[in-house]
């Protein structure tokens, strides 16, 4: 894999002699996953109608599955109907472990492109309020698209810095998810 040189240099500083082993990991097959939209379909019903042959459960989330590229889930009508979201399995963890109860007011501070926000919204089960925020206005287009496809009506999308949101919503939320923006290295 041809990684950006600046990234390799940064990783060399961090990893030192372990860098070659780390770089080799980029040549191994990656894990790919999808997460069922439980606001539209139950996990059991999805398993019953799923055309995908290679699905395996992601052990740390009840509605996550590994798949292989031969299944091509992004080309299936179920994807466009919002029955599932394509999400790297480790990225399923934050929203999966945050205990959300129906009727709560929840903030996803760094929400784009919407993977975690769609899970939080599904856990609210059309109750309460989810404020899906991303400081980058350009990233909210993908966020809006994903939330719309998921059919979640109780969501407010904002594009503000966290300190400004605090002025408007001070002590308002029952739960806050901050999966702070990363470098995008997971996309390599």
Report residues per predicted region.
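S-adenosylmethionine
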Residues: 1-188
